[in-house]
């Protein structure tokens, strides 16, 4: 397996094209973050960044999401490097805590700073980045009255109501319905899907759906 290395200068850090797993060394201990893969590039490069890591850990029979944000600076772009093996139900609560911390720190806030998920670009053989700054998460069921797009675990199956559809057809289907009152469009992800599967869904959504929206749907994890 090849590795993605990190290179830092005075004002910016750039990811170099070398790996699919991050190797971190601290106190003689090696820690890996196995990244999701995709053959679609969303954002190729991010500068002025802070890396944050969420590791896959096992303690007894329990899986743990362990966060390392020692290098994070509020005013920079945050890159979340998250292990693809973690279930979404463990990842998103940690992501929400990080979002809340950054949004609440008005003293050091930079309106231009973004948050990104990193993933391995299998075409460019380097890291690519997926923005999620404006995404709001909820660890619950959507409220009644919302129009739910459901993303199932394991088979890349997407449903609107009882109808299975392609991700590229979500907006076409939504706008074709003659609502008396247009409901909020929301996304619901199976909490037991892997983070890798979630990112693969999100990359397709960014490509075909959300880049065409002014306001992003709230994402429910349940």
Language-model features: locations:
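Long, low-hydrophobicity, acidic/polar, solvent-exposed interaction domains
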Residues: 28-222
